[in-house]
A protein has these predicted regions:
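Cytochrome P450
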Residues: 1-406
């Protein structure tokens, strides 16, 4: 135990490179068992606390009075410079303003509204899988890249002819979750340019909706501007947030799903034989893969936790993936079991900031699994996965696989 504690002193949890190897799960298991509230001193970025147990992650995320969301909401260089979304974006607000922002777009994310997308999303998934089966050997990251863009684009009101552009720009703009893009000046410049182009695209789309409104999210953002509830810049930040939230986690979650089934082939056969397990399988995928690694909160007052003092103004990282591997809550937490019945995972968050797109995310995964079972008989890795070096996303640069038809 002393050697593990000594090793922890030399690990910077804000360094994305630490997460490029799945061995990080062992470090978080140690923290859950021996140091559930851990102080990460200033290094890559300012110092911060980490909570790793399920009970603590749930408590901190639910208590928006003690632990606020108005600062930077993820680890990254913006903690030095400040975050443009602070106090303005849905993820960076609390209380009445958060409720008001959420209400503006809630109608588009109800289960009833999402259900209308099912036939369309199923066709996108089936076409992507059929094309991959024709190639046989593919990078599965590319195979599933269109699914999240297609779904959020439909809700936003983006024409199908622009999907390719949206995929290209979102991949470039939000690829900065990768350590290589954070350290390369040219890559950072490309990401900034793509991000600017996305915001200009949003501005053009809002201009169109002012004269030709539709039943979509962009129209609702324009209506909120007209009512004085949002500035144009705030509306563009909202558009930005929905694209990011609907793209990275869903895409990498689908890739992580296939990887989990390749690691546990008996679970794949179990699901193919019994589709009644689809719902619990989706829950287990979300728990086991945990596409979103963490969120940040800021202490609004001095508070004590596990006998240690968190000072007002200090940041606290809520590590969702660690909570989802907590043996105090989950039996055999490191095992992938699609029949798991007790599964109160935190992959979609909890409390006031519970994922706005939860119904969409779960439907996407359920359709993806169903079509995967329909079309793919077996999958095998051609080479080990190349993981993203990211503190934010449990994702992949590449997963080269061979797919065989059902």
């Amino acid at each position: 135990m002393n050697s593990a504690r000594s090793a922890l002193d030399h690990i910077d949890l804000a360094d994305p490179q630490f997460f490029a190897d799945p061995g990080y799960h062992r470090v978080f298991r140690y923290m859950r068992d021996h140091e559930p509230l851990h102080w990460n001193p200033e290094g890559t970025e300012p110092g911060f606390w980490s909570v790793t147990r399920y009970e603590d992650c749930m408590a901190v995320q639910k208590d928006s009075v003690t632990f606020g969301s108005t600062g930077t909401n993820v680890l990254g260089p913006q903690r030095w410079t400040g975050d443009d979304g602070s106090g303005r974006m849905l993820t960076h607000t609390d209380g009445a303003r958060h409720t008001e922002l959420r209400r503006m777009v809630n109608k588009s994310f109800t289960p009833r509204a999402i259900a209308k997308l099912e036939p369309y999303l199923r066709s996108v998934i089936s076409q992507s899988l059929d094309e991959a089966l024709e190639q046989r050997e593919v990078n599965f990251v590319d195979t599933v890249s269109l699914l999240p863009v297609a779904s959020i684009a439909a809700l936003l009101g983006v024409d199908k002819s622009d999907w390719g552009l949206l995929l290209q720009l979102t991949t470039s703009a939000f690829g900065s979750a990768d350590q290589e893009l954070q350290t390369s000046p040219s890559a950072r410049a490309s990401a900034a340019l793509a991000h600017a182009q996305l915001l200009l695209y949003c501005q053009d789309l809002m201009d169109q909706r002012r004269t030709s409104p539709r039943d979509d999210i962009v129209t609702r953002l324009v209506e909120a501007q007209n009512a004085g509830q949002l500035t144009e810049e705030d509306a563009m930040l909202f558009f930005d947030l929905l694209l990011l939230g609907g793209n990275e986690t869903t895409r990498h979650g689908a890739v992580g799903t296939l990887l989990a089934f390749m690691e546990y082939p008996e679970q794949w056969e179990r699901l193919r034989a019994d589709r009644s397990l689809l719902t619990t399988a989706v829950g287990e995928v979300l728990r086991y893969v945990s596409p979103s690694k963490h969120v940040l909160r800021r202490a609004e007052v001095d508070v004590e936790l596990h006998g240690r003092q968190i000072k007002a103004g200090q940041d606290i990282a809520i590590w969702h993936f660690s909570a989802n591997r907590d043996a105090r809550v989950f039996d055999a937490p490191d095992t992938f079991d699609i029949g798991r019945t007790h599964n109160p995972h935190l992959a979609l968050g909890s409390g006031p900031h519970y994922c706005l797109g939860a119904a969409l995310a779960t439907m996407e995964l359920e359709l993806f699994l169903d079509e995967l079972c329909n079309r793919v008989g077996a999958a095998s890795m051609i080479e080990p996965p190349a993981r993203l070096a990211s503190t934010v996303i449990s994702g992949f640069k590449q997963l080269k696989v061979e797919l065989r038809p059902a």
